Amino acid sequence: MKKGFNTKCIHGSYLPKSGEPQVMPMVQSTTYRYYDNDEVAALFDLESSGSFYSRLGNPTVDNLEAHIALLEGGTGAICTSSGQAANLICMLNIAKTGDHIISSNSIYSGTFNLFSVTLKKMGIDVEFVDQDLEFEELK
């Protein structure tokens, strides 16, 4: 049975097994116990999935990311602690040392600082331009 949009908003992709909570519970743990070093090694080597430290992910965040991807029709999502963390992840995935980026000069001051200070330290040059310029004027 296909889920409607409202059902997806509430339940996402969470499918409880018999005897499990109807709604995905919030996991309030920072660390996870494993009885076998090989299990942990497989997690670190990305050979298996699971949680080992909440700063890197946990079942609650995994569920949120899957939920957002489902609602957006995407294949995955990344949730971050802040918009600035999201901005940095985006920039580091499209630019590398020696690259030149053009940005509007009419952006959030924190993003301006990220672009003009942090990215500069990483060897990524950002040029700020008037957002009302025509494409031909940028050349």
Question: Could you say what each language-model-derived stretch is?
Answer:
Residues 73-74, 100, 136:
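Well-ordered alpha/beta subsegment
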Residues 1-48:
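N-terminal glycine-rich, Lys/His-bearing helix-loop that initiates the first secondary-structure elements
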